Structures are given as structure tokens and as C-alpha cells.
Amino acid sequence: MMLQLICNPRRITSNSFYFATLVLLGLAVAGGTVSAQEPVRLKRADSFLGIHFDFHAGKDCTNVGAHTTPAMIENIINLVHPDYLQIDCKGHPGWSSYPTKVGHPVPGFVGDPLRVWRSVTAKRGVALYMHYSGVADDHACQLPGWAAINADGQPNQRATSLFGSYTDRLLIPQLRELATVYKVDGVWVDGDCWAAVRDYSEPALKAFRAATGIQSVPRKPGEPYWFEFLEFHRDAFRKNLRHEIAEVKKASPAFQFCSNWSFTDHMPEPVSAPVDFLSGDFDPENSVNSARFAARYLVRQGKPWDLMDWSFAMSWKDKKNYGPKTAEQMQREAAVVVALGGGFQVYFKQKRDGSIYDEQMPVMAEVAKFCRERQSLCHHSEPVPQIALLLSTPGHYRKIDSLFGRNNHEANGVLQALVESQQSVEVVGEHQITGRLSQYPLIVVPEWDYLDLQFKKELTDYVRAGGNLLLVGPKTAALFKPELGVELLGKVKPAGSVRIVKEGEFTVRKSESQGGRLDAQSVSFGTLAGTNQTPAASIKSLGRGKIAATYFSLGLDYRDAPSFAVRNFLNELASQMFTNPIVRVEGSADVDVCLMRNKGKLLVNLINTSGQHRTEPITKSIVPIGPLTVSIRQAVKPAKVTLQPSGEVPKFDYAAGVINVTVPQLKIHEVVVVENK
């Protein structure tokens, strides 16, 4: 009846109009919007495209809300048509950019800007999420007992204690306020896992001793029980995360929760908290490569996921801002994520009064159009197993000296060398691949010096059953000496320049190396120069499969200074084992290949990664590449082959179980779509 009265004003009598007005006012007071009139908003699991705004408000913010108007928000939505907006409410300094009753508000407001954001987004059917700094809170650290204590006994200036009262007295009440008073859809908790630190407060040390029985507390790497101390704090973070989610959802079960970078390549492990989605943001200096790695890991985590691009480039080292990115640059960075089935968002700064820079939205509109053209084809697509690159959970946690630092440079370099050889690669953890190793024709273990014994056995069994295992680096090779048939000589030489002889000679810098002596069944692949012909790598048959290793590391060198020689060496070695990939692409080394499936279609994603995107933070234009020859192995002749989203129908031939397609030109991202019905 209410909807009929509103939609047909001629039917409204004076009494019914009065009654309707009272009801509408009551709804407005109770929830901030008229729920009966609100379009349905997408859950994050179904969302594809968003915009993130934040400004890490501080004590300088004295007129927040002065220029936050409905027209400003309407303009964003009209230009970009996002599924969600994500806006600032509390950054790392700890000041809240809305008039909170439970937190620490900035000094001055003009009205209530958060109610304006919520009212407009609800009316337009756009979800609203909060950017909220979790563990990192400078202001909270000033309060007694709320800061983590450093090894020197001094309070940490940014990281709150996982053993103090911050979570229960501020974080949970404030998220409840956002969920129940402001009716926002969810939260993207920044400064969380990556901001957590070791804590030497009395409550933390008491809990550590009680949990482990260890009385001696390590203060620095190398001291006894250092790893155990780190693991204790990692588990404390997990418990804290589960606790805060449970408490907030008691008040608002539909509230959607994400802890930025938790259960991603920053924290590579099984999802152990009831987060609603996973997310992270790119490296603002080297976005393509950070997206390549993070997206390939997230796609197998079993949760809805997205990644955030930065709309500008900056240096973490000197905080230099290189300026805004072009639409083309962000389109390519989006393509890396979209091609792997993920959602995409872009970060824009808010002004110090909380309003946005309207002039930046037309560029975002161009990026949004590019993404939307690919949404129905790519969103929620899944990889076709080809090469698995291991991001080892125990290997990673034994390697780093922080709780959840992203020190995966070696693995990232190996990934880059493989994808720049046009290999379709996934980045997987043990939990993502155990029990299904046989699905992958090749598994690569990149420079890990520790693996759990059970998983090592699973890898060996995989090879004996017909799989192919490639180990990169002497320390990784040392874990499989009997299987490789190698006797390693002397000690691992520390990182330095290593010369490799293989159809010529090339140098790998920042490389650890170790000589070795092979048994009669192992075949040498290149040699380490100046080492009396000891192998640079080797291959050996083991059962029905093959196992290979390099006796020099190459990930750091390739990550920092990619070279054709290093890439070619690794790809040739991989190709000795992985002889029959589903797809081959020829014509350029500047193309990433992502082999995916979605809705019964085989998708060969091609991404133009040409140019100096590693070293030049701003890409003014992307030069098209091509023509490319794409060969797809398939048992039956396809019913249809198209290029999407362009809609072109290319000529193709099918012979001997192979589809051959020519892509005349690749500007940024195109998909060869193979349909069999």
C-alpha cells in the first residue's frame, strides 16, 4: 500500500498523506534511509567494481563535511557506476572522520558527512564500506595499556597490543556503531595483519609463557625460540580477528568484514577467520608485478576477492609522489586482476575536509568502462591448472622476521620470469594444492629452504606418479638431494655474481650458488662457470615423472633487473619437463597468458605488459603488440572462436588437435574465447 501511495499521488487523501509522511519520517529517523524505497545493494561476493577513498584524518581536520554534498556523491555514481564505494572513517593516526560517539573524532565537522554518503548510496543501490585502521592506531597507542611494547621496553607509536583493551573498548564498539547507527554495508580494515608486531607487554609475555611453557623471551632474530615467539603472535592476531568479527556480527549479522591483506600473499595461509571477502592494494611503484603475484594467489583462496589499484604512483622510500596515473595505465593494471577472475577497485585520496577531487572521476569512468566490458566474461572465472608456483606457508614464516611481512621477492622474480615466457602460472600454498597435485603438469618450488616433511613426501610421490617438479636455488635443491641424484659440494656461496654457461655465457647477480656432483642417471643442464664443470641445473627421471633443480638462485636478480638470458634458461628447463601446455603464444615476450574457464568457455587471456612499468611509475601510453599466434590444444574442433570484448571473429584453423588463431594486435587486454557448443 505504501509503495502504491507514493507511486500514485492522485490516490493520496489528506489523511493518508499525513499517515505516509509520519511513516516515512519514522523510517528516516530509525535507519537514515527509507528502506522500502532502497534498491537492493550487491553483496561484496557479487560485486565487481568499486572506488576507495581515504585521507587518514588528523587533528588538522577542522571542517570535515563542509563540501561533502549529495551532488558530489551523485556525480561519482553517475560517471563511474560502481557496485560499491569505500570511504574513510578512521585512518592510521586514529582520528575518526565522522562524528563518532564512541571513538576519537577530528576537531571539527560541518554536519554529519557519513550520513550524507549513506543516504545517497542507499538511494542509488550502491554499497558503502568503511576504510578503518585496525591494529594501526597512533592515538590509541597513547592510552595506557593499549600500545604494543617494543623489545626495548618502549610503547610502539603505531601498533596496538593484541593483549590490551583496544579491541574491546574501541574497535568493536566503533564497528558496531558504523553497522547499527549508520547502516553501512561493511568494513575494509586497513593497517591490520601487516601492522601487527611482537609485543613485550606483561600481558603478552604472560600469555606466551602460559601457552608455550617457554620462559626465556627472545628479543632479536637468532635468539632461542625466536620462531616460536613469532608464531605465538601470529596466532594471537588470528584469534583477535575472529573475536572482533564475531562480536560485531552479534550486533549486525549482515555486516561484511574484510581485513586488508589477511590471507593473501602478505599472510599466505588457509583462511581461518569468517571474513566475507579478501582484499589488498597494489605496490604504487610496481603495480603490474604486485598484481601479478597477489591475484594468482587469491584466486585459489576460496573467498570472494578483489585488489585495489592506486590512482597515483609514489615511492615508499622517499614518499615522492609521481602524480596521477593515466587511464591506460590503470586499465592494464585492472586487466591483470580481471583476467584472473577478481574484482577491482581504485584508490583516490579525499581532501582534508573529506570531500573528493571531482576532476579525477572522468579518468575513473574510463577505467570503469574498460572493466565493465570484461565483467560478464571474466568475473569469477577459474584457472585451468598448468604450472603451480609454490608460496610455502611454513617456508615463508620461517624466512621472515616480522609477523606478516611480504618478503616474497625471490618467488615473485621466478613468477615474472615464467609469465614473461608466456607460461600460464598459478601461485599456490600447500593448503590450496595438497591432494590435487596431479592436476598440475609442472610444480615449481622457488627458493624455499624449508618445507614440511609431509608436503615434501607429497611432492616426491607426485613425481613418482608422473608429475614434474622444478626446484629453484641450491637451498631448495638440498631438500631433495637423493631424488635429484646430486651430491652438493661445500657450502652455499653467499649472494653475488654467478656466471652460467649454456649455449653462451651470462651472469646472474644477487645469486647464491653451490657446486654439485651428479649420479649417472641425472643429466646436467648448463654449468657454473669456474667450478670445474659442475652443473648449473640438472634433470632426472624419477618413477614416471621428472625432477629438476637449479644450483643457483635467480629470483632476486630477475625481479630487479630482468634479462632474456635468465628468463630463457628457466623457461628452457621448464619446457624440458612441461612439454605439452594447453596454450602457446608466439610473437612477443611482452604478453601475459592466463588460461581460465568460465561458464563452460575456455578463456585465453592476453595482457600487453610492454614498456618499463617496473622502473617508470607513470605510463603515459601503451604501445600495442602483435601479431600474436595463439595455439590451443583441444581434442575436438571448436564450434566458435572469438576475440572479446572486441567481438571480432578471427580466422582459425584446426588440425592435429590444435586450434591456431592469429591476434592481429593487442592493445591492452583481449581474450581468445573458445566455445564447443
Predicted regions and their residues:
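Aromatic/acidic polysaccharide-binding cleft in carbohydrate-active enzymes
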Residues: 295-362, 384-403, 536-564
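Mature N-terminal, pre-catalytic/accessory segment of carbohydrate-active enzymes
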Residues: 32-91, 100-102, 106-108, 119, ...
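Aromatic-Pro/Gly-enriched surface loop or interdomain linker
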Residues: 334, 362-439
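Aromatic-lined carbohydrate-binding/catalytic grooves of carbohydrate-active enzymes
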Residues: 78-113, 136-156, 182, 198-204, ...
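Substrate-binding cleft/loops of secretory-pathway carbohydrate-active enzymes
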Residues: 140, 195-198, 237-295, 316-325, ...
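The substrate-binding groove and active-site-proximal loops of carbohydrate-active enzymes
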Residues: 53-68, 96-111, 154-172, 222-239, ...
